[in-house]
Design a protein with these regions (language model features):
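Conserved donor-binding/catalytic core segment of Leloir-type glycosyltransferases
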Residues: 7, 172, 182-199, 205-211, ...
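A conserved mid-protein helix/loop that constitutes part of the nucleotide-sugar donor-binding site
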Residues: 19-24, 196-210, 229, 314
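Short His-centered aromatic/hydrophobic patch
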Residues: 85, 100-108
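Active-site donor-binding acidic/aromatic loop of nucleotide-activated sugar
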Residues: 225-230, 243-251, 257, 307
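Short hydrophobic beta-strand element within catalytic cores of glycosyltransferases
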Residues: 287-290
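Conserved acidic donor-binding segment of nucleotide-sugar-dependent glycosyltransferases
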Residues: 302-314, 322-328
Length: 360
């Protein structure tokens, strides 16, 4: 299938970790001379596609931030959007010599409607752990001929559901300069993540509240549906136990932000599949304190980071303090992290391997 045309399908027009991987795959496929179509809603993702790529507009295929009765109504509307998207996808998926790659869980039902049985590869960026995810995955399962998971932890639930699974890891730029060393005064803890509830910002704020000598920087944007959550975080940051110690950076260059940090935290309360923010920090040799589940556990194993029990602000505060207090630990963790990234997550190797797994 070396010369096959590729159709990528995404549920959102926004850009976060999964869409950054999609853009790298698209660039690699364009470099191979393949005809490429990306079907997704309008937005930053479509705006960042190379000129050689055809964009086909889909309706948004995810749930918004509604709750209660509004969420029920939203789910009904989502069913209609899946049907509309499936009709748009049908002629694209059924063109001769086209391989379809679905980049997000919430696009699966539309792909099933558009292509029928065993019609697509699925690049799995979500660890399927809750009922909503399992329901959507079950709807889309007949359409998937192969699931390409970005970590073993992400592949395991799919194997249990009967999917044929292969693992192709995420990657980050390598080599990159080492960061860290002498602590800032006062020490700075950083987190690079979309401002959305499952990323665990509440847990991190409560942890830093227990560390009065530490400052916190939160880098990352937010989607409109999470405006209430962002307001909650901003209010928490002004409470007496945190006032003046928390900065919201918004969208920033990750390396530039991390240059001012001593410890990087990944506080997700649900398992991450293959978090790029963790790999980026590790590539720079910064010590990562991360929730001990999902792909994060795999990345931090063997001394390449410091895991803590997910959702536990007391344990997180203790882990941060331990890292700040021990220069030798920071150095050894940074060494192990950089060696791990060099061996397993160099994007120059991972993207071609992932593209081959999806297209073959």
């Amino acid at each position: 299938m070396t010369d096959s045309a590729l159709l990528f399908v995404a549920h959102t027009g926004n850009v976060s970790g999964a869409e950054k991987v999609l853009l790298r795959l698209v660039a690699a496929a364009v470099g191979e001379g393949r005809p490429i179509t990306v079907a997704c809603p309008t937005g930053p993702l479509a705006d960042r596609l190379p000129d050689a790529v055809t964009h086909v507009e889909l309706p948004p295929l995810g749930l918004g931030g509604e709750s209660g009765a509004a969420r029920v109504v939203g789910a009904g509307r989502l069913l209609g959007r899946w049907v509309r998207a499936g009709r748009i996808l049908r002629p694209l998926m059924r063109r001769g010599g086209t391989v379809t790659i679905v980049n997000s869980l919430f696009a699966l039902p539309a792909v099933r409607i558009g292509g029928g049985r065993s019609s697509a590869s699925w690049l799995v960026h979500d660890t399927v752990v809750n009922g909503k995810q399992r329901a959507v995955t079950t709807i889309g399962k007949p359409a998937i001929r192969k699931a390409v998971a970005v970590s073993e932890a992400t592949g395991d639930p799919l194997r249990a559901m009967g999917f044929p699974v292969v693992v192709a890891h995420n990657g980050v730029s390598w080599p990159v300069p080492r960061l860290g060393g002498e602590l800032h005064s006062p020490p700075v803890v950083g987190m690079l993540a979309l401002l959305t509830p499952w990323k665990g910002h509440r847990v991190l704020l409560d942890a830093v509240a227990r560390l009065p000598h530490v400052e916190l920087e939160l880098a990352g944007g937010s989607f409109p549906g999470d405006a209430g959550y962002v307001s909650e975080l901003e209010a928490r940051a002004t409470a007496p136990d945190l006032a003046g110690r928390v900065r919201f950076l918004g969208h920033v260059d990750p390396a530039a932000a991390m240059a001012g940090w001593d410890v990087v935290v990944s506080a997700s309360v649900l398992p991450e599949a293959g978090p790029l923010n963790v790999l980026e920090a590790m590539s720079h040799g910064l010590p990562v304190v991360g929730s001990d589940h999902g792909g994060t556990s795999e990345f931090l194993a063997g001394g390449a980071g410091v895991p803590y029990p997910p959702g536990d602000p007391v344990a997180l505060a203790a882990a941060i303090q331990r890292v700040l207090d021990d220069a030798e630990l920071r150095s050894s963790v940074g060494d192990a992290a950089r060696a791990y990234v060099a061996a397993h997550h160099d994007v120059n190797a991972t993207i071609p391997a992932m593209l081959h797994a999806l297209a073959s």
